[in-house]
Amino acid sequence: MPTRPQEPDRAASDPVEPVPEGAGRPPRGDLPQPGPPARPEATNGEPGPDAAGPAPAEDEYTTAIQELEDRWRRTLADLDNLRKRHARELERERAVERSRTAAAFLPVLDNLELALTHAGADPGAIVEGIRAVRDQAVNVLELLGYPRHAETGVAFDPARHEVVGVVQDPDAPPGTVVEVLRPGYGDGERQLRPAAVTVTKRE
């Protein structure tokens, strides 16, 4: 079988034309050079968002916190001053009340000393003098708002009486005060003490 002659390789046989230097690519001076990212420029003479300094919202928040702290400190100072002023006024009122009460009993002491002075000359007069002083002291307590309770024949009242004895008495209904061993003074919230009494019981 006849052999077909091979054709020469055109790519190998064709001469390669040299490419001029710099052809097909931009000059080096036209290549983009890497650099820092561009920042937004200021407009109308105002600093950009990356300018130094806190944001306006942060400034407002800080200012609001400072105002609240100042108000809180002023409120604490006002409360402390109010507490001290109230304590001073309360102590002053107590001192006035103590002075008023003590002054009310000065005449009682004067009459008691007068009765003791005359006791030597007339021993029988001492009883009347002591009774008069007692009545005067009772009147002073009543004027101060503490009336005396020493009644018998009245019904037992737990708000005024304290039972210290129980007896049988056919002439009095049960629960009747038949004897007062110690008078009471005052009523309700202003009670100094209840009266110590003896009451009747059922048979």
From Swiss-Prot:
The keyword Ion transport does not apply. Residues 45-56 have a biased composition (Low complexity). InterPro entries: GrpE, GrpE_coiled_coil, GrpE_head. Pfam families: GrpE. One of its GO terms (cellular component) is cytoplasm. One of its GO terms (molecular function) is adenyl-nucleotide exchange factor activity. The keyword Cytoplasm applies. Transmembrane segments: none annotated. CDD domains: GrpE. Residues 1-64 are annotated as: Disordered. GO terms for biological process: protein folding. It is found in: Cytoplasm. Gene3D superfamilies: 3.90.20.20, Head domain of nucleotide exchange factor GrpE (2.30.22.10). Keywords: Chaperone, Cytoplasm, Stress response. Residues 1-12 have a biased composition (Basic and acidic residues). Participates actively in the response to hyperosmotic and heat shock by preventing the aggregation of stress-denatured proteins, in association with DnaK and GrpE. It is the nucleotide exchange factor for DnaK and may function as a thermosensor. Unfolded proteins bind initially to DnaJ; upon interaction with the DnaJ-bound protein, DnaK hydrolyzes its bound ATP, resulting in the formation of a stable complex. GrpE releases ADP from DnaK; ATP binding to DnaK triggers the release of the substrate protein, thus completing the reaction cycle. Belongs to the GrpE family. Homodimer. This is Protein GrpE 2. The gene is grpE2.
